[in-house]
Structures are given as C-alpha cells and as structure tokens.
UniProtKB/Swiss-Prot annotation:
Swiss-Prot/TrEMBL keywords: Acetylation, Chromosomal rearrangement, Coiled coil, Developmental protein, Disease variant, Intellectual disability, Isopeptide bond, Metal-binding, Nucleus, Phosphoprotein, Repressor, Transcription, Transcription regulation, Ubl conjugation, Zinc, Zinc-finger
Compositionally biased intervals (Basic and acidic residues): 1-36, 624-640, 652-673, 688-708, 1162-1206
Protein's name in the database: Arginine-glutamic acid dipeptide repeats protein
Bias (Pro residues) ranges: 752-767, 809-827, 914-940, 1030-1052, 1106-1117
Domain ELM2: 284-387
Region of interest: Disordered: 1-90, 464-495, 542-1133, 1162-1246
Record domain BAH: where: 103-283
Listed Polar residues bias regions: 465-474, 709-720, 829-840
Gene Ontology terms: biological process: branching morphogenesis of a nerve; cerebellar granule cell precursor proliferation; cerebellar Purkinje cell layer maturation; chromatin remodeling; dendrite morphogenesis; radial glia guided migration of Purkinje cell
Cross-link Glycyl lysine isopeptide (Lys-Gly) (interchain with G-Cter in SUMO2) residue location(s): K560, K637
Annotated domain remarks: The interaction with ATN1 is mediated by the coiled coil domain.
Effect listed in the UniProt record for changing V471I: In NEDBEH; uncertain significance
Amino acid sequence: MTADKDKDKDKEKDRDRDRDREREKRDKARESENSRPRRSCTLEGGAKNYAESDHSEDEDNDNNSATAEESTKKNKKKPPKKKSRYERTDTGEITSYITEDDVVYRPGDCVYIESRRPNTPYFICSIQDFKLVHNSQACCRSPTPALCDPPACSLPVASQPPQHLSEAGRGPVGSKRDHLLMNVKWYYRQSEVPDSVYQHLVQDRHNENDSGRELVITDPVIKNRELFISDYVDTYHAAALRGKCNISHFSDIFAAREFKARVDSFFYILGYNPETRRLNSTQGEIRVGPSHQAKLPDLQPFPSPDGDTVTQHEELVWMPGVNDCDLLMYLRAARSMAAFAGMCDGGSTEDGCVAASRDDTTLNALNTLHESGYDAGKALQRLVKKPVPKLIEKCWTEDEVKRFVKGLRQYGKNFFRIRKELLPNKETGELITFYYYWKKTPEAASSRAHRRHRRQAVFRRIKTRTASTPVNTPSRPPSSEFLDLSSASEDDFDSEDSEQELKGYACRHCFTTTSKDWHHGGRENILLCTDCRIHFKKYGELPPIEKPVDPPPFMFKPVKEEDDGLSGKHSMRTRRSRGSMSTLRSGRKKQPASPDGRTSPINEDIRSSGRNSPSAASTSSNDSKAETVKKSAKKVKEEASSPLKSNKRQREKVASDTEEADRTSSKKTKTQEISRPNSPSEGEGESSDSRSVNDEGSSDPKDIDQDNRSTSPSIPSPQDNESDSDSSAQQQMLQAQPPALQAPTGVTPAPSSAPPGTPQLPTPGPTPSATAVPPQGSPTASQAPNQPQAPTAPVPHTHIQQAPALHPQRPPSPHPPPHPSPHPPLQPLTGSAGQPSAPSHAQPPLHGQGPPGPHSLQAGPLLQHPGPPQPFGLPPQASQGQAPLGTSPAAAYPHTSLQLPASQSALQSQQPPREQPLPPAPLAMPHIKPPPTTPIPQLPAPQAHKHPPHLSGPSPFSMNANLPPPPALKPLSSLSTHHPPSAHPPPLQLMPQSQPLPSSPAQPPGLTQSQNLPPPPASHPPTGLHQVAPQPPFAQHPFVPGGPPPITPPTCPSTSTPPAGPGTSAQPPCSGAAASGGSIAGGSSCPLPTVQIKEEALDDAEEPESPPPPPRSPSPEPTVVDTPSHASQSARFYKHLDRGYNSCARTDLYFMPLAGSKLAKKREEAIEKAKREAEQKAREEREREKEKEKEREREREREREAERAAKASSSAHEGRLSDPQLSGPGHMRPSFEPPPTTIAAVPPYIGPDTPALRTLSEYARPHVMSPTNRNHPFYMPLNPTDPLLAYHMPGLYNVDPTIRERELREREIREREIRERELRERMKPGFEVKPPELDPLHPAANPMEHFARHSALTIPPTAGPHPFASFHPGLNPLERERLALAGPQLRPEMSYPDRLAAERIHAERMASLTSDPLARLQMFNVTPHHHQHSHIHSHLHLHQQDPLHQGSAGPVHPLVDPLTAGPHLARFPYPPGTLPNPLLGQPPHEHEMLRHPVFGTPYPRDLPGAIPPPMSAAHQLQAMHAQSAELQRLAMEQQWLHGHPHMHGGHLPSQEDYYSRLKKEGDKQL
C-alpha cells in the first residue's frame, strides 16, 4: 500500500512539474504575442466569462491601451517592455492602476471598457475602486505604498466558479493567476437604451422645447455623445480598460448647448435604470435622497406693509416647545391605548402591537395633543374615545379597491384619470394615499402597473458570482464576454510575409490603405483601419469623411455601407439596437445580437450572417483570417462570388413554391429583407429569383468560404435570404458582394468617393473579379453603345436588381418608412451601379452577354433605372423613359424581361414593418432566374431590342420601394394601357392581353401563340439564360432583356399569378413539362397563358426550403405510373406521373385518405355537405323561378286590365298627372312606392364594391342642376305646369337603365301585389273604404314618380317657360337630386321619336284610367248619386260663409272655392276643421293657385297662362261645381295612387269618419 501511495505522490509531483512548465511556456508565448496587433472579435456570444478566453492582462493591456492603440510590429522581438502596475496605500487599498503605456487610472475616472464585439462600441463607465483578487497570500504586503505587478487576468472577472481560484492559487505569491479587478458604474449610450424609451424622450424634448431654438441633439455628432448615467455597478478586469474619457453633467437639454464635442468627451443629463428600463425623468419615478432634494434656505418673510404677519393665513399644526420627556410619556400612553384597542378588535396581542406601532397612531396622537392645547391629560381623554384612527383600508370598500386596481392596470399611475373614470367619489389625494398603502400589500405584487413593461431582470443575469464579488446587479456583459478575439488576420501575422500582405487591405470606410492593423468593425462588421475602428468603438459611429478619396484600384468599389458615420446606416439603426444593447450589459443572454444589436429571434440566423465582410460572422479564426488575408484580387473575387452559394437553395426553393402567385410575392420581401445585412428575416429566406451560375459549386453554406476563394469567376447573386444556420453565407453575400452591388441607392450610403452624378464604374482589375464584365469586344459590348449616355465600358456588376426582392425596403406595411434619400432605393443597376444617387441621366448600358459559356456571367443584367422619385415615389427615368424610340430601344426598355416573381411583393406587404428602414445596397446579379413557377416567355432577341413606346415611365423594377403594396389588381381587362406620364406602365406582363404592345410592330402576330419560338441569334442570347443558350440549366425561365412582353394568346390556359407589387410583373407560369424543367432555349417555350390576376390574400405561408436540384437538362416526358409511393396510418400517396429525377408535388402525386380514417370521414362529410347545399340552392332557384313566373303573369294581367280601362274611359284628361299638384310640403303626396334609392346613372363600376368607391362615385356624378347633367334635348322646353319637370328631365333621358330598372322592377313587383290585393278588396261591393292616413310629414315625393317608373311622361312641345319651374318651393335639395336620379329609364334601343311616342301613349292610358271620376268614386265605393248629392249640398251651403270660415286657417284665395277653405265640404275631400290636411297643408300661394289647373284657365293646354276675366255668380257656381268634382277626383286619385299603408301610420280618425259619413249619405234617399 505504501508503495502505491509513493507512486501516487510521485505522479502528482510530476503532474505539478508539468503544469508549471506549461505555465511558463504559456507566459513566454504571451509575451511574444504581445507584439501582435489587437485581435478583433467576430463572436456573437452573449455574456461569457472574460477569463475563459485565457488572455493575460498584459496582453489585453498591451493590445488595447488607453487610446486603444494597437501595437504595429508583427513578430519582431522587442526589448522587454514595462508592465502594468498599481499603487497601494499602507492600508492595502489600491489607489491607481498604471498601464504599460503609463496611462494612470484612478477611482472616479471615466473610462472606456472593451466590449469585445467588433460591431459594438466600447462600454463607458466610471471606476469606483480597484481590488486585487488572489489566493490566501497577498500580492504585496509591504506596509508602505508600493508599485506591484498586477496579476495575469485569466481568472473570472467576477464570475468564475470558486474551483478556479483554488487551481490558480497553487502558484507562488504574486503569481500571474492573481488578478486586478475594478468596480465600475455604467453609463449607457443612447444606442444602448431601448428604442421605445429613447423615442419617448426625444418626443418629450421636442414638445417641451418652446425656446424657438433647435435642440443640441439635432446635431448627430452631439446626439451620439449623450450618455445616461446609472447606479448599476459591475466588476471588470483592469485589463479591459481602453482609455479615459471626460463626461460632463448638464441639468437639462437646454444647458447642454454648452457641450463641445471634443475628443473623448461625452455628457449626460438623465439617469437610466436598466432594471425598470426607464429614464429617470421621463416616467415619474419617486426620487428620494439628498441628490434629489432642493436645499432651501430658511424663510425670511418680508415685513408686510399692512402689519399682517405672513403666516396669518396659514394653519398651525405643531408648536415645537413641548418637553421631549413629556412628549415621550404621552406617546407611550397613546400607543398603549391603541394597543389595547387593537387587541380588543383583533383578539390577539400581535394585533395590538401592530396597531400601536403604526405611524397613523402616532400621528393621530400628536394631532390630538396639538388640538388639546398641549394638555396631555385632555389629549389622552380624547384619545380614549378614539385611540386608533380609522385605517385607510377601512375607508375603502371592496368594490372601490377593485376599481382602483382596475384603473391602475388600465391607466397606470394616472390617478387623475382613475378618479375621473372609475372613482369620482374619491379625491385624487385619497387615491395617492391609498396607492402607497396598497403597493405594500401582497396583491399589489401581481398588479403593479409598471411590471407590464418589465422583464424579469433578476433572471437575466447569467453571472455566477465569486465570494469576492459584491452582490450588485450587473448590467453589462460580464467582462468575460470578451472571448476569443479571432480576427481576420490572426494567424497570418505569424509569417514575415504577412506584413506585405497587409498592403492589399483598404479601409472600407475611408479607403485608406495604410493602417497599423486591419479589423472588422462598425455596425456592418466591415474591414476598417485602426483610426476608423477606434472612432467607432469610442463614439458608436464611423468618423465623418471630410475629403472623400477614390477607392484603391484593386477594390471595385468598396462594399461600403457607411457613407459618413453620420448619415450612414448605423445612424438610423443605432436606436434599433437599444433594447438588446442594454441587455448586453446586464449579461442577459438573449440571442446574440445582430450587428445593430437587435435581438429578435428572427434575426438570429441572420445575425451572424449580417456582416459584410467575408469573415465577419465566422467565429473561428480560421474562417475569418483565411478570407481577409487573401490577395486583393482574390478578395474582390470572393466578394463577387460569395453570395452565390446561398442562392442556390433559394432558387430551388422557389421552384417548389407552387403557389407561385402569392407566395412569390411573399417571398419578395423576404429576400429583400435579408439583403439588408441585419434585417430580421424569417428563418427561411427564399430568394425568388436569383440563380447563381455556380451551380456545380457546393451548396452547403459552409463551403462558401472556400468557394469564395476559388478562382473561377463567380457572380454575385442577389442576396437570397438563405438563412442557413451557418450564417456566413449571408454575411458574405452582403459583404462580399462587389461594391458595385452595393451601389448604394439613396439610402445605403455610397462610397463617398463617387461623385453623385458620375457613374462610378469600378475599374475591372486584373482579377477574375470582374465577374460580370463582358470583355469589351464581346458581342454584347456592342449593345452598350446603343444606349445614349451610357458609359461604354460595361458595368462590371451587371446585376439585375433582384426585383422586388431588392426593393430593399418595400414597405411591408401600408405605411412605408420614408426613405431618407431622394432616390428610389432600388436602382441597383443604375448605369453606374454605384452612383449613390444616380440621377438616372446616364442610362445604364444593357449589359450584354459575354461569350456564351457555362458561366456567361454577363447573362442578363437588366437595366434598372434609378431616378428622382416621381410623385408616386416611382423613379422617373429621366432620360431613359423619354428616350425617343429611335434611341436604342434596348436602352430605354429597362426591364421587360425581368419578371419578378409576384410573390415577392406580396410578402412584403405582409411583413410587419421592419425596424430598419435602410435597405442594404441591393445586391444585383447578372442572372436573375425568375422562379420556376413564373417563367418569362422568351422572345426572339431581335425583338428584344424594340423599345415599346409607352415604356417611357420608369421601369417597374426601379420602382421606389416606398410605394405601399398596390391594391388588389382588378382583372386585366380593366387596366388601362395609357399611363399618366408620371406613373409606371403596368409591368408589361400585366398589359391587357387584348392590346399588343405598340412597341413591337415587327412582332408577327402569331408569335406569341407559337410554341416554338425561333431561338434567339447566338450573338445575343436572351439574357435570362444562365448558360449557353442551347442548354440553360433553368431555361424554363429565360429573360429577354428588352423585348416587349409577348401578348399572351387567349388560347392558353389562364393561370393566375397575382402581380403583387409595383415592381413585380406577373408572369404566366408555363404549364406542363416546360414548367417543370423543359428547356426553352432549345426553342420551345410554353404558350403563354393569359395572365389573370387572382386576387388572393397576401399572407400565404412560405414554403419550406427544398434542396437545390443539380443543374440539369430538361426533364424527361412524364409517364403515367399510378403506383402507391408512401402510406401512413390514415392516407396513402400515389405517384401519378413519373418524371425521372424531377417531380412536381402538385401534378405528379395525389393523396388518398384510407377508408375509415378521420380524413376520409371529413372528406365524406364535406362532400355530403356540398351536395346538401347544392340541392338547397337548386330548390331555392326553382322557387324563385316560380315566383318570377307568377309575377310575370300578374303583370300581364294588370296590363290587360289597364288596356280595358283605357278603352272604356275617355281620354279627355290626357296629361292630367303631368299637371302639378298643389305646391307646399303637404301637397305632394308620397308616391305609391317608396322613393327609389339613389342609384348611379353612370356605367357601373365592375370591381370590388367598397364604401369608399361608392362614395367617390356619388361625388363624381354631375349635380342635378349641372348643365352637363341635362340629358333631355335642349330644343324640348320643359313643361311650365310641372315645376318638378326641370329636375326630372335629366333622369328621364338617362340611357343606362340596367341597375335602376332591376331595382325598380323588383320593388314594383312587391308593391304591385299589395296594391292589387287592396284594389280587389275595394272593388267588392259593400266594402267600406278606410283609406290609410295621409302622412302630413312626408317630404312630398315626386308626383311624377309614377311616370318615372313607367317611362312615360308627356312633354307638351308648346309650353312656354315658367319662372318657378326650376326651383320648386316644396322640394328640398336632396329630394331634387333623388328625383333626378330616379327618373324614368327609357330603353336605350328606342329611337328618340319612338320614345316620345311611347311616353305619350302611356301617359294617355294612365291619365284616362286614373282621371275618370266614376272609376275613382267606385274605387272608394262612393256611388255617383252621392257624388251628386254632395254637389247639391255644396250649393245649399254656398252662402254660409261665416261658419265655414271658422275652421279655416286664413283668408281664402279669391279663385278658390270658398267651401274648400271651410270646414263643411272642403271637397279636398276631407272633413271640416283644422284637420292637418296633406292636400291643403297651407293656404296655397297665389302663384300656385294660378298655376293649378283647377284654379287657372279651364284648358291650360290650349290657353297657356291666360287668367279669365271676373265671372258672373252663375258662372262662379258652375265653376265651384266643377271644382268640387275636380278636387274630389284629385283626392281620390291621391288615395288610390299614393295612399299606401306601409308608408303611413294609422288612419286619421277624421278621414275615416268622413268617408264612412260620405258613404252613409250616399245610401240615403235624396
């Protein structure tokens, strides 16, 4: 046993020795590493322990010293340098820390702390104190102040578990394992505060700014210097220090005007609490403590002139002269009384103690003492009666408490609102008092108002604490988040050559090629020089560039996303990152934040990929270093190629999206979104259109790095949202896209070197990177000259803008974020592709094909025309659009071929608005492959160059992304081909099929119908083909660079592809084999089906990715197999068609549920239900038919009756009904039908009926009085006897009867039945008429409505004008319009004379029927002899003037039968008295009397306008007799035609009595 023990001891010693040796080696290695440049970190990691990165403090301090200057010499041995050290007092307190650069840090200093992520700036804090953490032995115990070497920092900053300490402690005293820590108090940058909080602050500041001067924060530089102080303290390594800064405090934003943005200077005004996520001043926190209390001097009142003391009106509540001892005794007595009372109430001694110890009890006792004049005896006697004041909770009922809590939840601590809405019986002060009581109760814990906005802060922190760490809330990432600092250049400096390789680098911001070192940094993780990076780290923004320099020749155009630090992307993004930034500090491990700090889960995969440099997202040093170190040529190439791989997946993905229409549109936004480096894209980005040429390349995103380095020319493909978990794919896409791609549209900053107006064609370098540039001699180069003003050198990156996908920011929602720049965000291809604001005067050359070859990269750049935004935000093509047809049609015909998958835009519209308004520079690609589902028909190339004349609007592709998604498209037939000059023509494929585009006169008509289009001449292969024309891998989607879209033959099956966005053109999907893979290049293209746009919801779910198929030739013809291919418990899949290795889930497989399965039952039920519904519908249909048949029969019967009556009666009163009724609101009785609804007299709008459109159509209709509405012939004078005719004529001659007729017919049918029934009843002998009451309040419907419905109205040709015809007194304006609109609809097919004749005949019939007095009386069962009796009766009473006048309301007109005004036989025919008579509502106006046929001339038709001379008494009697008959006839007519029960309420008893009396009189013998 002892031997074993000895062996074990020996082994342990050996292990210890080995450990010591390794330690020494590591120390040496660290010292040698000190000479290396600082390594930047590309990790996404959250809060990881600093110590895990195993960096020594020396290294950290060395690498980033006070000013963060990194050492520049690589691998050169240096003389040993000074080490960092610290000073201690004799008490052991560390007073200062001195770095190797002699920067001295002391407690109280404000400093930068390394954030360890290249895309986040340094953290800023103030040092509270230093402490040394080591094992039991102290580093230095000397009693005198001493300088000590600080320990190495490989132990946790504040969070390593204890066992590390014990391991580390084995070293000697002062061992490197000891470490120097510091407690720091954080300042938060504006970008680290949650966006919502900061936005509220900005809003408040602007609202409160009444000074008339701009706030200091309008200057972006100063805005970025504002910090928010916090009380949160963390412990960090001294090694994380990166320099000192100065922080000033200002009392408010106005005082901050004095701040000068000097180097390393910041200011703060407010505090920020990361726990509650609130700013101190904005949300009303309670501030207690000396720092928040005002220091008030003692009051020194002015002597008042009138001798009153200033305190006269104040209430004295306490006099301080009481003896303390007496006071204490009194209070004890009071409390003991309260305790006794409490014990009695509660039943336990605890209750008594609680009652005694309450503040309320003490307060009550003191108040009572004061009120008792400081007589303790009296006070105690009073207290006996009420020793304990009523508790606050007892003053509130349960219901009030509930309402209070509800109010708190609803309105927060807005007590005024709570009182107003819920507790009006309480005072606001009571609410506040109760709140402070309530908030301490247990139920308050779940109801506190602010918790709604809080996250559980405690659990956010992942730090484990060591015993030495103070228990304070960490709010920054534990210092050890620093982790691996691998950088692009980490290992490359190991060799001497690496120094030379550095010369190939250039800063992507300032373009300098000289720098101490190169690291990725900035919000976009681009390659930066030391100065730019340090500036970003300190101030959170890249430095402004005062004198832009040209990018070095070897860079195409730098992938520069940051224009100036101020206006670049990040300036808009910084706030977006706020939420997650603050969490960074608090160590919360949210998702790794994206470069802009966002942490939404969606971002997660892009997050890593969102950087723009090849290595940005790779965590391992290998990836990153390998890429950036490549020679510049390779580098450029990589940039071009990196996006390729990720595209592959998308490409196929789209192919699998069979719901091409909506889906494509939904994808669109997605692709776009990713094309912003940090856009939160959905997990699967699906690019809808780009196909990269490198099909054979590996599609695994992990291979992209290698592929990028490969030398084969690769093309940048539009960035498809490939969201593979390995994010490097995207990152590369974005970052590596040749700068050309990044051609910043107005929003993405363009290389500052590019003067805005000049196209910046990057000079193609010797490297293969000039991927898309066809050799100048190549056939395509010949096309370029066609474009006027286009730079002749083909633009290297002929990138087609990935149509909508590139509308980088098509507003996802109808409220598009405004684009900061004047130009449409897209313009990717602008002639200069790089012009930041390409004014669109230079037409981008049509990039032609390169020599055909498997990778002819030049394949199809379609032109994008940038331009200043047009009224719609569409960039006008200033020069292009207006290019005369003569100028190279191709040039002005921007994109006919590039059909974007409609889907993309649709998606955009449904995506929630993204938080980053900045579109990343659109990536463009030479080949954009339209998604397989929406092939673009190919046209022969020669035609492709025809310039359609009406394409003069900017191409839809360059459409401004700001446009909200277009409303659902109506069927194409309704699209007009005439576009206002400023609007885009609809995407070509959307033109109404019936109109061949004028642009291609040469196009043979049969072209579009033929299935085999002649293949385009080899010299201009259609740009859409990805490879040589004969075998394009995806030929089914060729694009034609500029051909007019084929007119789709009507014979093709119409497929529906909704074009979903301004930028998308719907392409008819090819059907059959062509869609699934047939090569069109070979010459066959599927007949283009008519494009029908299906209006579908835009929110189809996205299809999952499908693996990219290998590039291939057309699939074999399908063979029918019908074999089961897969079975599950409930269903079986059958393979219907076999296409070899290619298959289409939609057409080749079908799915059969097994009998008895739930699915089968569901389907059976659905079929049953459908059958039942169909039967029900059929039954209803049959019933409706029967009803219609009956109605037709009734109508025929009625017409026969009317004819018989017309023959029987005389036609003497021909135009009776066209004579006006008495005027006045009461006289115009409602017609027998309810007034027709207002129906447009304009051709109906065929399309979705919406209230808004309906309202607009009403507004658009000419007014009734408008001369344009005068539809009747002008030579036809209006009948002077009918004041309404003026209003009625326009409706009378309207010739679009369809809608109105249908409605009128239906209503007539319904009402005719009712009328008929009543009429039959009335015609029965012995039926006693009880006419419905006349409605005195009804607004007098048009007396001619009857004729309006029967399309007949006599228009006497001879009548002269009447002064009152145009403004009838009894008609309100709405009624006039209604009458005009409801006018009779004459059948359009009748000629004008026929129409007049028909009107006249019909009027005669109706008049003869309705004006026959006998017929009328019979209708009411009033016999003729009674009629006679009534006349005699009237004669008998002729002279009883006085009694007759008693009931009349006013004098009688001389021409009116005096009896008509009198009570007895008013003959209108209503009983006497003040009956509210609708026929005589007011005494008629004189003019009306003269105009009325009864009181005017006997034959107004023959003697227009003449008033007869005074008549003799006999004549007068005769006239009265006639009038009586006439009036009775009129009344009867009114009753018959207009008195309808459903229009009026109950009967007027007076009418009823009158008619029954009339009938009884008729039954008497005369």
